[in-house]
Amino acid sequence: MQTLNTTSLKIVDNQLWILDQQALPQEKCWRPCPDVASLVEHIQTLRVRGAPLIGLSASLLLALLAEKGLSQAELAQALETLRASRPTAVNLMNNLDRMKLALAQPQFVAALVQEALRLVEEDRALCERIADHGAALVKPNSRLLTHCNTGGLATAGIGTAIGVLLRAHQQGKVTQVWVDETRPLLQGGRLTAWELGELGIPYQLICDSMAASLMAQGQVDAIWVGADRIAANGDVANKIGTYSLAVLAHYHQIPFYVAAPHTTHDPACPDGRAIPIEQRAAAEVTGVSGSFGHCQWAPQNAAVYNPAFDVTPAALISGWVLDTGVVTPQDVKEGIFQNTLK
């Protein structure tokens, strides 16, 4: 396969490498990904994260394994193993559905390679269109708040919600970005703060619990988040803490926007109650680990509830900003998400 470079994925000498997002920002560490077991581990430990990126990494690995000579039966098994690695992120399922169709072709090796590379290029283009649509909604001198990480680290392009912030910044509209640290794994503090700094976008990092105070003071003009799955009724699954922000935004009458590619939409999922929510290890809440080391602050035997995602009801969302355009609450009431988006 040809050499490929994105912010978080690269292919060099027919080997997939992933940027270890658990090591950032202290260390920029690229890790090899030679087989399915290694990628599943990288996904489940969040070295690879972000709904679009998870789907792309799985697709690229399948194509590389096909080039290395795995049979159709072996690739089919690999595909299903990868499908089970992160149940909430529907981009993974959608990408693998397309790779499964390619695998059924007589010339399946070439078909898999072509489809994987097509998915990467499509994602780059999707990000650009999301940014354009979203930036049109950003008013001059805006102070924006974002949650988790939705930039180039999570996609093949400039990102979803962060892509909107970047485009609006390039247009001179952004005064300030408030970055939620995003407990328990600190994707906002570790990743979004790093990305915004690299992009030259002015930001300030806050604890998640500080967002309400900022809104009450009139310091937030709009909230921009990403999505891991959009249900047929417009409900959105995203990083835990997103729902809290949506409730706060609704109370303070602040626009709350979801930026995502149309591939995050799942018309087969009727509403948020049908979205599987991944439960993660207690150690993520009782302490913290990273390239900086490990610290535990809770009692060793503390009982922990640690869902990776929550669901924001459609009624709390001001707009779904997709590559296909901006979906309004009225569009949702009329059933736009009931069918496949194109």
From Swiss-Prot:
Q: Which UniProt keywords apply?
A: Amino-acid biosynthesis, Isomerase, Methionine biosynthesis
UniProt-annotated binding residues for substrate: 49-51, 86, 187, 238-239
The UniProt family comment states: Belongs to the eIF-2B alpha/beta/delta subunits family. MtnA subfamily.
- What species is this protein from? Pectobacterium carotovorum subsp. carotovorum (strain PC1)
- As given in the record, the signal peptide range reads none
The EC number(s) attached to this protein equal 5.3.1.23
* Name of the protein: Methylthioribose-1-phosphate isomerase
Question: What Pfam family is a match, any one?
Answer: IF-2B
Give the pathway.
Answer: Amino-acid biosynthesis; L-methionine biosynthesis via salvage pathway; L-methionine from S-methyl-5-thio-alpha-D-ribose 1-phosphate: step 1/6
